[in-house]
UniProtKB/Swiss-Prot annotation:
Organism: Caenorhabditis elegans
Lineage start: Eukaryota, Metazoa, Ecdysozoa, Nematoda, Chromadorea
Name this protein carries in UniProt: Zinc metalloproteinase nas-19
Gene Ontology annotations of biological process type: molting cycle, collagen and cuticulin-based cuticle; proteolysis
Disulfide bond positions: C82-C230, C105-C130, C232-C252, C254-C263
SMART domains cross-referenced by the UniProt entry: ZnMc (SM00235)
């Protein structure tokens, strides 16, 4: 009977904190109302959430260039989640952003106030060596409660980790580790050789260059929304795997490559190709960074390849021009979205001497989307060939 009363109280409190179509829960009240052990295990460290989903912050010093990146990271998260940011040095729960004299890029996991009953205090976020907007989104994601993707409790299903470094150990599933699929391309993933060569390899080696990429993914924001209980009272009929955006309930959050309020539009300056038969067609497409409001610091050019209904679209790369080969392909690269879940990051290519450059990519998606991304104004280009087939053809 006591547990039933606690459960009813928790439900009442949950609905009492829903406003403007969004759910922003006060974890203190829920914990006080419904605290039996099973729920504590399920929502482990729930007290590290920011109260009502509001992140209070202030700058401890000045650096206009870094501050601009911080503000862009804040805007990106706010535009895709119900999390709100408030610049307030005197808030009882706040993060101090330090941009000088530290040469670090790091943050504590979770909000200040580790006790459920006292969500107060201050933590520091060090951002002087954060060199991309995605890196700062990574640190804010820590502050919001996310651990690294490579420490998920299910990571051994996707990676072989041999390092004994303490920070690489698997984490329990209580935070945002299990609110969406494992993703090698997550902004929360380190590059494969962070702890030394061969210490953190993906089981699918085509993903090795993808690990450590600093584009913010569809699932990166989805997991935050799931963890904070972000939702809209009215759900839109979003297309292509999108969902109603808890930042603005009149539009959808869309997977990469889909645009418009309902995710049913394509990029205006995109390339649209038709695979007309099973003969290979070749094309070279240029791409480069250009400023775009609300971006994660990268600009993407999208290619849409359409084939015959129920056919397989095959794509193979023939050349990369001025695409910079780095761990994590962090400057520019090519992503052919061929995975069954088109919302998840497929293997990224930026090196001609490493997998999966020589692969024949086979996709059942119609259209199949290719993303050419860059954060440099240096003109780059990719040459590839494509076709459709009803057979699983392997090039010799």
């Amino acid at each position: 009977m006591v547990r039933l009363i606690h459960l009813i109280g928790a439900i009442i409190l949950l609905f009492s904190y829903a406003y403007c179509g969004l759910s922003r829960l006060n974890e203190h009240d829920i914990e006080e109302s419904y605290s039996h052990k099973r729920v504590k295990r399920q929502f482990e460290r729930l007290g590290t959430k920011w109260s009502y989903g509001v992140v209070n912050y202030y700058y401890a010093d000045k650096n206009n260039e870094i501050k601009e990146m911080v503000e862009s990271a804040i805007a990106y998260i706010a535009n895709h989640t119900c999390i709100r940011f408030n610049e307030d040095q005197n808030a009882v729960q706040r993060v101090q952003i330090r941009m000088q004299q530290n040469w670090l890029c790091q943050s504590t996991v979770g909000a200040p106030g580790m006790s459920m009953s006292k969500p107060i205090g201050e933590l520091s976020m060090l951002v002087q060596s954060c060199d991309t907007i995605g890196s700062i989104v990574h640190e804010f994601s820590h502050s919001l409660g996310r651990f690294h993707e490579h420490t998920r409790p299910d990571r051994d299903n996707f990676m072989k980790v041999t390092t004994t470094v303490h920070e690489a150990r698997p984490r329990p599933s209580g935070m945002t580790t299990m609110y969406g699929p494992f993703e090698h391309g997550s902004v929360m993933m380190y590059h494969a050789d962070t702890y030394g060569p061969g210490t953190m390899d993906p089981l699918d080696m085509d993903y090795k260059q993808t690990m450590g990429n600093r584009r913010v993914t569809f699932y990166d924001m989805y997991k935050i929304n799931q963890y904070y209980g972000c939702w809209c009272s009215k759900q839109l009929e979003c297309k292509n795997g999108g969902y109603t955006s808890p930042s603005d309930c009149s539009r959808c959050n869309c997977p990469k490559g889909f645009f418009g309020n309902l995710c049913d539009e394509r990029q205006q300056d995109s390339y649209e190709l038709m695979a007309v038969n099973n003969l290979w067609q070749s094309i070279t497409i240029p791409f480069a960074y250009k400023p775009e409001p609300g971006s994660d610091g990268f600009y993407s050019t999208f290619v849409y390849i359409t084939g015959k209904a129920n056919s397989t679209i095959e794509i193979t790369l023939e050349g990369l021009q001025d695409v910079i080969c780095t761990a994590g392909c962090t400057v520019n690269g090519v992503e052919i979205k061929f995975k069954e879940d088109s919302k998840i990051t497929s293997p990224v290519v930026c090196c001609t001497d490493k997998p999966p450059y020589k692969n024949v990519f086979k996709s059942s998606h119609n259209p199949t989307i290719i993303e050419l991304y860059s954060r440099t104004t240096l003109p780059s280009a990719v040459t590839f060939k494509y076709r459709f087939t009803n057979d699983k053809v392997v090039l010799g």
